[in-house]
Amino acid sequence: MANIVFKLSDKDITTLMSRITFDTENLPQGMKARAKYQNTTVNIYQSGKVMFQGNHAEAVSKELLPQHSQLNTNKTKKKNMANSSLEQTLMYDQFNCIGSDEAGSGDYFGPLTVCAAFVTKEHVPILKTLGVDDSKKLTDTKIVELAEQLVAFIPHSLLTLHNDKYNIQQAKGWTQVKMKAVLHNEAIKNVLEKIDSSQLDYIVIDQFAKREVYSHYALSDIPLPKKTKFETKGESKSLAIAVASIISRYAFITYMDQISKYINMTIPKGAGAKVDVIAAKIIKKYGLSRLDTISKKHFKNREKAQKILKPL
């Protein structure tokens, strides 16, 4: 399905609205008018942007906005690509979407957690009221607070790849990208079993690999490939991804707290110098084998921690 976007003046919008019949009532927040014309949806936003959506979007846009189509024939594609992040923010939250994201992939300690969540357009106002946002902008305390509310009413699937299984798969030659592709795909399929898929508009995955790479690792088993989109920095473009990010991060934080209690010391997130020091302390107190049960063995932190202990 093609999406073509124009930025119009008030005068041009008035002209467009005189050419076909638009609905102006009971519209999502931020939308000024909507029309169906020749199997194409035409959305006019309060921002002055107009989106043509459908298999005939290009032909319809040329018919209804001939002056813009002629002027922009050679440059609109590049311009729309440059503006795609902004437009996707508008688009996804106007539709019913499954979003998926993961946590723990860049952390030496702790598991890899993946969540897929189904967010309808009716959920959007309450999610905004709750303060749902990119999890990277939220404190751990806020993530826990939000997640405990979200899991109560958002259909979702949360999968956890614990360190023992993670290390086994990595030793078999699985890259982290392959692990994530398999987990994302499985979580999405789990959510599809919980909902009426006829109500689903898009599946939006926080992009960690190109579509063809994801498809390869998922054994070409993407459930609804035509509805599946990949978005970089997806948390800021889709509330469905933001919700999935919060829930997956919540699960990761919970496991990290459990690890800290298990080891009887505060375990830092990430993979920096502080992590090396704590890993060295764990080796000294409990041994390397214990460290491997709560960490990702292939990270450089393991080697660095051992080097810290050598002079001792």
Curated annotation (Swiss-Prot):
Coiled coil: none
Gene Ontology CC annotations of this record: cytoplasm; ribonuclease H2 complex
Catalytic activity, EC: 3.1.26.4
GO BP, one annotated term: mismatch repair
Annotated ranges, domain RNase H type-2: 95-311
SUPFAM superfamilies reported in the protein's UniProt record: Ribonuclease H-like
Keywords: Cytoplasm, Endonuclease, Hydrolase, Magnesium, Metal-binding, Nuclease
A single MF term (Gene Ontology): RNA-DNA hybrid ribonuclease activity
Gene3D superfamilies (alphabetical): Ribonuclease H-like superfamily/Ribonuclease H (3.30.420.10), TATA-Binding Protein (3.30.310.10)
Cofactor(s) the protein needs: Mn(2+); Mg(2+)
Residues annotated to bind a divalent metal cation: D101, E102, D206
First-level EC class: hydrolase
PROSITE patterns in the cross-refs: RNASE_H_2 (PS51975)
Protein's job: Endonuclease that specifically degrades the RNA of RNA-DNA hybrids.
NCBIfam families per UniProt: rnhC
Family: Belongs to the RNase HII family. RnhC subfamily.
Protein name as catalogued: Ribonuclease HIII
Natural source organism: Staphylococcus aureus (strain JH9)
Gene name tied to this protein: rnhC
